[in-house]
Regions:
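Catalytic cores and adjacent flexible loops of soluble metabolic enzymes
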Residues: 1-186
Length: 186
């Protein structure tokens, strides 16, 4: 509901973060506009929804594209659409849309392929269990990490088993910061 989104947005801001979401239709997009979202995410299933992406571009706020179910030509079409509209405030997240994703299914080097081929900010949308794939992605240059979050791993749901508890999420973030320190001399 709109009230819930407003509450979540305030909670995120109060904790030094921000809320963004993947609108699947124009009604959801307009709801995000009303709450003054600071970014949009295009889920991999929406990558070919040109009309909604064009509408997002008009708002001139960051767009994060997830590539999970997108083919290479879909990615190129999305980037060309941004190019055509002189919009360059976007990133591509590498993703494997399997719940959960095993290490053998990852091909995490694809992050480097996306960055080199398209010369854009890249990240990783994770569906593995644990933090290892996220840490590997950061060590390979991912600038954005998306990881599912839960307060209770015993709940039912397609993504709950691979979601992180608050404690594990905090530890993952600390490990990411340590990797960043190892990579860059300030």
């Amino acid at each position: 509901s709109e009230k819930s989104l407003i509450s979540l947005t305030k909670f995120a801001e109060d904790n030094g973060s921000f809320l963004f979401s993947s609108p699947g239709d124009f009604s959801s997009l307009n709801l995000l506009r009303r709450i003054n979202t600071t970014a949009y995410k295009v889920s991999s299933g929406q990558f070919t929804n040109i009309a909604i992406i064009e509408e997002m571009i008009k708002d001139n706020i960051p767009i994060i594209f997830s590539t999970g179910m997108a083919k290479e030509e879909d990615i190129e079409r999305g980037i060309n659409l941004c190019d055509k509209n002189n919009f360059y405030n976007f990133a591509l997240l590498y993703c494997v849309s399997l719940y959960p994703t095993s290490s053998q299914q990852l091909n995490i080097d694809y992050i480097n392929h996306l960055e080199k081929k398209y010369n854009v900010i890249t990240g990783y949308s994770d569906h593995t269990i644990g933090e290892l794939a996220c840490l590997a992605a950061v060590s390979m240059g991912a600038k954005i990490i998306e990881k599912h979050f839960t307060t209770d791993n015993t709940l039912t749901g397609a993504d709950n088993a691979l979601s992180m508890s608050p404690e594990n999420f905090k530890k993952m973030c600390e490990n990411i910061r340590n990797i960043e320190k190892m990579k860059y001399i300030s």
